[in-house]
């Protein structure tokens, strides 16, 4: 999508990653190393339908959003509710700041509504402000990867579909939706069993819709669950699920 929306009357500077910017890369000592294999215990979150799309404004690209590009959206008859990258930003802030992530028990994927699949290194520090996050996403969507400042380590990368090629074979895969079967307690999502049993250490995939309105549709999940009597934002759903896994797995 491109355009010169009438509401845009000034050039905006591309907000990218500076060479000395610590915003995107935390000290490795703050994290436990996550060795990914088919049997290792972890929560795998997939943010589906993320509304991450770039738009050309004058001579630069920006992350399309309903606040900054109202003119472009009107010109193209786009619903403001369909351009909410801030939802993905809120979810990623919550997930990557969680104790579960610091303990090395969280893995995150993002798939956009245009079917772009993104993998994010657990050691990535998500930008605090939306403006900086938007600049980073533009960089990622155009260059397909973001690397750490001090090494060749990839912090974010665009990877090949399908998502099932990147998660353990045979693990449980659940989708979250207000219309799903109500679970009395989020902890019911956590694999249960004796600590010495294989089921105790099983990874589990949970899919959350990263959009404001609409129905979450996937072809790889087994069951659809609701975790509240009330509709929840994607970020709150992420928070409740992470907290449940932290409680069961003893992460403090």
Swiss-Prot record:
* Keywords of the record: Methyltransferase, Nucleus, Ribosome biogenesis, RNA-binding, rRNA processing, rRNA-binding, S-adenosyl-L-methionine, Transferase
InterPro entries per the record?
A: Alpha/beta_knot_MTases (IPR029028), Rbsml_bgen_MeTrfase_EMG1/NEP1 (IPR005304), tRNA_m1G_MTases_N (IPR029026)
Q: Which chain positions carry the site (Interaction with substrate rRNA)?
A: 84, 125, 128, 132
| Residues annotated to bind S-adenosyl-L-methionine | 176, 209, 214, 227-232
- Name the enzyme's class: transferase
For the site labelled Stabilizes Arg-84, the residues are: 86
Under Enzyme Commission nomenclature, its number is: 2.1.1.-
Q: Where in the cell is it found?
A: Nucleus, Nucleolus
Can you cite an annotated GO cellular component? small-subunit processome
GO biological processes: defense response to bacterium; ribosomal small subunit biogenesis; rRNA base methylation; rRNA methylation
What exactly does this protein do? S-adenosyl-L-methionine-dependent pseudouridine N(1)-methyltransferase that methylates a pseudouridine in 18S rRNA. Involved the biosynthesis of the hypermodified N1-methyl-N3-(3-amino-3-carboxypropyl) pseudouridine (m1acp3-Psi) conserved in eukaryotic 18S rRNA. Also has an essential role in 40S ribosomal subunit biogenesis independent on its methyltransferase activity, facilitating the incorporation of ribosomal protein S19 during the formation of pre-ribosomes. S-adenosyl-L-methionine-dependent pseudouridine N(1)-methyltransferase that methylates pseudouridine at position in 18S rRNA. Involved the biosynthesis of the hypermodified N1-methyl-N3-(3-amino-3-carboxypropyl) pseudouridine (m1acp3-Psi) conserved in eukaryotic 18S rRNA. Is not able to methylate uridine at this position. Also has an essential role in 40S ribosomal subunit biogenesis independent on its methyltransferase activity, facilitating the incorporation of ribosomal protein S19 during the formation of pre-ribosomes.
Q: What family name appears in the similarity comment? A: Belongs to the class IV-like SAM-binding methyltransferase superfamily. RNA methyltransferase NEP1 family.
Indicate the quaternary assembly. Homodimer. Part of the small subunit (SSU) processome, composed of more than 70 proteins and the RNA chaperone small nucleolar RNA (snoRNA) U3.
Protein name (database record): Ribosomal RNA small subunit methyltransferase NEP1
């Amino acid at each position: 999508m491109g355009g010169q929306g009438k509401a845009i009357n000034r050039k905006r500077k591309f907000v990218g990653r500076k060479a000395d910017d610590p915003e995107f890369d935390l000290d490795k000592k703050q994290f436990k190393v996550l060795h990914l294999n088919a049997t290792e215990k972890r929560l795998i979150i997939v943010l589906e339908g993320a509304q991450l799309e770039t738009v050309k404004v004058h001579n630069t690209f920006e992350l399309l959003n309903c606040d900054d590009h109202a003119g472009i959206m009107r010109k193209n008859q786009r619903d403001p509710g369909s351009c909410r990258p801030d939802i993905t930003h809120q979810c990623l802030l919550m997930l990557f700041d969680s104790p579960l992530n610091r303990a090395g028990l969280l893995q995150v994927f993002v798939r956009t509504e245009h079917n772009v699949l993104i993998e994010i290194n657990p050691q990535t520090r998500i930008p605090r402000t939306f403006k900086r996050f938007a600049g980073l996403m533009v960089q990622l969507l155009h260059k397909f990867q973001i690397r750490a400042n001090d090494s060749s380590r990839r912090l974010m990368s665009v990877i090949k579909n399908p998502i099932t090629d990147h998660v353990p074979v045979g693990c449980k895969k659940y989708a979250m939706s207000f219309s799903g079967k109500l679970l009395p307690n989020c902890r019911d999502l956590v694999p249960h069993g004796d600590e010495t049993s294989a089921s105790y250490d099983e990874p589990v995939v949970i899919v959350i819709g990263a959009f404001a309105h609409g129905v979450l549709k996937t072809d790889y999940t087994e069951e659809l669950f609701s975790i509240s009597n009330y509709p929840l934002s994607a970020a709150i759903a992420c928070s409740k699920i992470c907290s449940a896994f932290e409680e069961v797995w003893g992460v403090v």
